[in-house]
């Protein structure tokens, strides 16, 4: 049975969050295609992962027999997250832009799962896992826009998820999400609506495509 690791990090509830809305569309389609499958869900806003500590960090590079009690406890929490990453056949991440980068809760999760010699290094343990990131943002930071150089979500996640963890990464980017609430952006409402519709369509399409891909891979 296929396993989906679904991570949300928006501080807003589903009805007020662009990223949650799109990840929900992906997940609904995924569950329709995998009625017997498993979903591991992490809502990092509701139940934050602890930020990395010296004990949690150093324990990852210490001989298990030599870890202190505090190191062992801290590493156990990391290990749970690492094993969820490794179990996943597909990973889905909601990553809204906050102050030009990812939410701190998502950064905390990444700091926990990135372990040199296991999930990172010469042979990352989750290498090749299909990963879809919904990178919503209030404005537009696309190439050619005035704030192109302020884009630190996709650039950062490319470095961590693709280059370091070796994941097979794709982005869905709902943009201009502040347009309905910001009168100064009223002229951009049609572009926002188009972006929202496209993002939901892409989520459904990608969920179906990944189902076909997994089916083909399992049939080999």
From Swiss-Prot:
Reaction(s) catalysed by this chain's protein: 2 a quinone + NADH + H(+) = 2 a 1,4-benzosemiquinone + NAD(+); N,N-dimethyl-1,4-phenylenediamine + anthranilate + 2 NAD(+) = 2-(4-dimethylaminophenyl)diazenylbenzoate + 2 NADH + 2 H(+)
Q: Which UniProt keywords apply?
A: Flavoprotein, FMN, NAD, Oxidoreductase
Q: Which cofactor does it need?
A: FMN
Give the superkingdom in one word: Bacteria
Q: Which residues bind FMN?
A: 10, 17-19, 136-139
Q: Does the keyword Ribonucleoprotein apply?
A: no
Query: Residue ranges of region Disordered?
Result: 200-220
Task: Give the co-factor note.
Answer: Binds 1 FMN per subunit.
Its top-level enzyme class, in one word, is oxidoreductase
EC number per UniProt: 1.6.5.-, 1.7.1.17
- The family this protein is said to belong to: Belongs to the azoreductase type 1 family.
- Which PANTHER family does the entry mention? FMN-DEPENDENT NADH-AZOREDUCTASE 1, FMN-DEPENDENT NADH:QUINONE OXIDOREDUCTASE
Q: What does this protein do?
A: Quinone reductase that provides resistance to thiol-specific stress caused by electrophilic quinones.
Protein name in UniProt: FMN-dependent NADH:quinone oxidoreductase
According to its UniProt entry, this protein's organism is Streptomyces coelicolor (strain ATCC BAA-471 / A3(2) / M145)
Taxonomic lineage from the root: Bacteria, Bacillati, Actinomycetota, Actinomycetes, Kitasatosporales
UniProt gene name: azoR
């Amino acid at each position: 049975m296929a396993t989906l690791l679904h991570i949300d990090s928006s501080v807003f509830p589903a009805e007020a969050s662009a990223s949650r809305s799109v990840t929900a569309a992906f997940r609904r389609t995924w569950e329709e295609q995998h009625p017997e499958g498993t979903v591991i869900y992490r809502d990092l806003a509701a139940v934050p992962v602890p930020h990395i500590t010296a004990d949690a960090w150093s324990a990852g590079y210490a001989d298990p027999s030599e870890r202190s009690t505090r190191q062992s406890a801290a590493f156990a929490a990391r290990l749970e997250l690492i094993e969820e990453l490794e179990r996943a056949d597909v990973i889905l991440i909601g990553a809204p832009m906050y102050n030009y980068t990812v939410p701190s809760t998502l950064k905390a999760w990444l700091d926990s799962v990135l372990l040199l010699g296991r999930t990172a290094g010469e042979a990352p343990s989750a290498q090749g896992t299909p990963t879809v990131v919904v990178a919503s943002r209030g404005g537009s930071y696309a190439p050619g826009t005035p704030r192109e150089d302020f884009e630190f979500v996709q650039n950062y996640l490319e470095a961590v998820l693709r280059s370091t963890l070796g994941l097979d990464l794709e982005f869905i980017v709902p943009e201009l999400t502040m347009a309905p609430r910001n009168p100064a952006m009223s002229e951009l409402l049609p572009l926002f609506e188009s972006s929202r519709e496209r993002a939901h369509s892409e989520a459904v399409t990608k969920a179906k495509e990944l189902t076909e891909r997994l089916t083909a891979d399992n049939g080999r």
